[in-house]
């Protein structure tokens, strides 16, 4: 083996391995202290790009879950208020039935009307004051809003909240009253007992109801017969013996038309819009009609509450799915970017041992040129 003074190859080799061990030790310490095995693009360019995309998706999913929870909160707030609206309407219905009883005097009905007016005011107050985050929910101003429940654009769900004020047309319907009242001796005559009602059902389109009353039926029995033939309208009789028919705006579109011999004899007047806001139970006829109006309003409220319940269930399932996606996305990101501490501590120990060994060898290699002095004597 040649003895050189100017070039110490052994020292250079030891130095190179010492630098390599030091770099490996520094890298392991960086990974262990940060918790990430990818801290710079040079660590893993492709892995960094993929993990960043997954991180963006994960953060988007977190926001989507918060958005969905906000949507559920809005629906719960609105549905809770509508529950009280339902209670008010049920009380109004009870009062309407009570007022329609013949044992009540005019003063009794006026007192009942006062309670109905107070209930109506509270119903409207609930509709006007129910809010979430400054947004009014039930007075008709919320309309339709979108809720972003996905990590990317275009993943939105629409929520509509209806107007729950008592003067909303959907909280009632149309009233048709016969111009000619019938006394207790009036009966349906043979050959003049037909009545046709043409109306447009929102679900099935235009329909014509053909009714043939029995000979000898009085006006009350005629109303009962009409109610027994179809659930698309409600018939009742007022104090003056006038037949009145109510159609629900939630089910019937537009106005109904009447034909047949009975229609000519009774002479129905033009349709009149009626809602919970116009309820008047100071008369028997008004009390009877009020029951039908409240039933229509209850149907409207219950239908919307069912929609909100379905909306909440849908969002709960959406949140479960988002959480599942987020879990898998983060698991994938972790496999790419996170430090494996067991593996990295092993690598650190290895690099520390190699560093110490390289330092020891380098120290010995630096002493090799001293052998030349021995040769010089």
From Swiss-Prot:
Keywords, comma-separated and alphabetical: Bacterial flagellum, Coiled coil, Secreted
Coiled coil: 103-129, 301-340
InterPro entries according to UniProt: Flagellin, Flagellin_C, Flagellin_C_sub2, Flagellin_hook_IN_motif, Flagellin_N
SUPFAM superfamilies hit by this protein: Phase 1 flagellin
Subcellular location, record wording: Secreted; Bacterial flagellum
Highest taxon of the lineage: Bacteria
One Gene Ontology term of the molecular function aspect: structural molecule activity
One Gene Ontology term, aspect cellular component: extracellular region
Pfam families per the UniProt record, alphabetical: Flagellin_C, Flagellin_IN, Flagellin_N
Assembly with partners or alone: Heteromer of multiple flagellin subunits including FlaA, FlaB, FlaC, FlaD and possibly FlaE.
NCBIfam families: PRK08869.1-1, PRK08869.1-3
Protein name: Flagellin C
Source organism (scientific name): Vibrio anguillarum
């Amino acid at each position: 083996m040649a003895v050189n003074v100017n070039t110490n190859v052994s020292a250079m080799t030891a130095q190179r391995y010492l630098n390599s061990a030091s770099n490996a030790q520094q890298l392991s310490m960086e990974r262990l202290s940060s918790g990430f095995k990818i801290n710079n693009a040079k660590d893993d360019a492709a892995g960094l790009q993929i993990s960043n995309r997954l991180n963006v998706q994960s953060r988007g999913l977190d926001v989507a879950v918060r958005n969905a929870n906000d949507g559920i909160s809005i629906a719960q707030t609105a549905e809770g208020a509508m529950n009280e609206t339902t209670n008010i309407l049920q009380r109004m219905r009870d009062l309407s039935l009570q007022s329609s009883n013949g044992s009540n005097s005019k003063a009794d009905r006026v007192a009942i009307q006062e309670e109905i007016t107070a209930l109506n005011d509270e119903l409207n107050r609930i509709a006007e004051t129910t809010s979430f985050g400054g947004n009014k929910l039930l007075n008709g101003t919320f309309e339709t809003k979108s809720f972003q429940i996905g990590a990317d654009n275009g993943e939105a769900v629409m929520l509509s909240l209806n107007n729950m004020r008592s003067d909303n047309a959907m909280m009632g319907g149309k009233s048709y009253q016969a111009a000619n009242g019938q006394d207790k001796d009036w009966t349906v005559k043979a050959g003049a007992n037909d009545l046709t009602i043409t109306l447009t059902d929102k679900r099935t389109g235009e329909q014509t109801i053909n009714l043939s009353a029995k000979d000898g039926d009085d006006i009350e029995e005629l109303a009962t017969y009409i109610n027994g033939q179809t659930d698309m309208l409600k018939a009742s009789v007022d104090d003056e013996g006038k037949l009145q028919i109510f159609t629900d705006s939630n089910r019937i579109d537009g106005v109904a038309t009447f034909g047949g011999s009975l229609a000519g004899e009774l002479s129905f007047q033009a349709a009149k819009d009626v809602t919970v806001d116009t309820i008047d139970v100071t008369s028997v006829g008004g009390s009877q009609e009020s029951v039908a109006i409240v039933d229509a309003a209850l149907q409207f409220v219950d239908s919307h509450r069912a929609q909100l319940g379905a909306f909440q269930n849908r969002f709960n399932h959406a949140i479960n799915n988002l959480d599942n996606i987020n879990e898998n996305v983060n698991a994938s990101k972790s496999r790419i970017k996170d430090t494996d501490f067991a593996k990295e501590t092993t690598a650190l120990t290895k690099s520390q041992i190699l560093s110490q060994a390289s330092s020891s060898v380098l120290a010995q290699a630096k002493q090799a040129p001293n052998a030349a002095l021995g040769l010089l004597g």
